Amino acid sequence: MIINHNMSAINANRVLGBT
């Protein structure tokens, strides 16, 4: 389940960096 948390953070970072 910890991996899921990491994926969520990476997803948010990707969205922010895409802007």
From Swiss-Prot:
Keywords: Bacterial flagellum, Periplasm
Keyword rRNA-binding: no
GO cellular component terms listed in the entry, alphabetical order: periplasmic flagellum
Protein location: Periplasmic flagellum; Periplasm
Main location, first listed in the record: periplasm
Similarity annotation: Belongs to the bacterial flagellin family.
Subunit structure: The flagellum consists of an outer layer composed of repeating units of FlaA around a core that contains one or all of five antigenically related polypeptides.
Functional summary from the UniProt entry: Component of the core of the flagella.
The protein's name: Flagellar filament 32 kDa core protein
The species this protein was found in: Spirochaeta aurantia
